[in-house]
């Protein structure tokens, strides 16, 4: 099993930032992304543990949904880890999706992007088909609302194929167990923390 993520990481999309993010500004998104390279290196251990937890052989042509994909850092890692996989990158920022298409150019033909706002009920209607794995990285916490987070998990469950999984690497607030409860209430089984420290965790469950 991979070692846990480096404690020096300062993940993006942190709602504790003093300056609010403007994900609809091309200038802001470009400047923000330029500062992410070191953080992306720091996240590699978390991404690797997430990939190892997906219950499919690396050679299989699985379909992955990255919720709040941003510029595609997690998608990039997973498409390299699963060389026959394809991915859908969902995000609520058109500018971030543009940046994701640019940064994922080496994976041309293996990914598509969907613009929808997961803080709004019904966001998943923009997606088609089902997925062996639905994943997310440092994104869902941004809604900063337990009710909305529960709604996101509820909409994710029908998207997952039986035998598949939902895995979320995110900043979380106490009480910690609420996150597991909400994932269970959405319908997932064998829900647990796969790793956590004082402010971040990798957690999720499986669809029987």
Region spans (language model):
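Conserved class I S-adenosyl-L-methionine
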Residues: 2-57
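Class I SAM-dependent methyltransferase SAM/SAH-binding core
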Residues: 65, 71-121
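A short acidic, Gly/Pro-enriched loop at the edge of an enzyme's catalytic core
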Residues: 124-134
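A short SAM/SAH-binding and catalytic strip from SAM-dependent methyltransferases
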Residues: 132-147
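A short glycine-rich, Lys/Arg-flanked "PGG" loop and its adjoining helix->strand segment in the class I
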Residues: 150-162
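Conserved beta-strand signature within the Rossmann-like core of class I S-adenosyl-L-methionine
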Residues: 163-170
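Short alpha-helix
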Residues: 174-186
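Core SAM-dependent methyltransferase catalytic element
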Residues: 195-208
């Amino acid at each position: 099993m991979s070692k846990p993520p480096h404690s020096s990481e300062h993940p993006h999309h942190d709602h504790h930032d003093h300056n609010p993010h403007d994900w609809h500004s091309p200038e802001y998104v470009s400047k923000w992304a330029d500062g992410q390279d070191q953080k992306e290196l720091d996240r590699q251990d978390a991404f690797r543990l997430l990939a190892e937890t997906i219950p499919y052989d690396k050679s299989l042509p699985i379909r992955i949904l990255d919720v709040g994909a941003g510029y595609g850092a997690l998608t990039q890692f997973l498409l390299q880890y699963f060389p026959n996989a394809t991915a859908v990158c969902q995000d609520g920022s058109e500018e971030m999706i543009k940046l994701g298409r640019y940064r994922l150019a080496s994976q041309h033909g293996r990914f598509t992007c969907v613009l929808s706002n997961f803080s709004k009920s019904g966001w998943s209607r923009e997606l088609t088909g089902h997925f062996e794995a639905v994943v997310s990285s440092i994104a869902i916490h941004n809604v900063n609302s337990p009710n909305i987070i529960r709604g996101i998990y509820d909409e994710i469950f029908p998207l997952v194929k039986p035998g598949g999984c939902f895995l979320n690497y995110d900043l979380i607030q106490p009480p910690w167990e609420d996150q597991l409860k909400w994932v269970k209430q959405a319908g997932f089984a064998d829900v647990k923390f796969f790793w956590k420290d004082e402010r971040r965790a990798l957690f999720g469950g499986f669809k029987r």
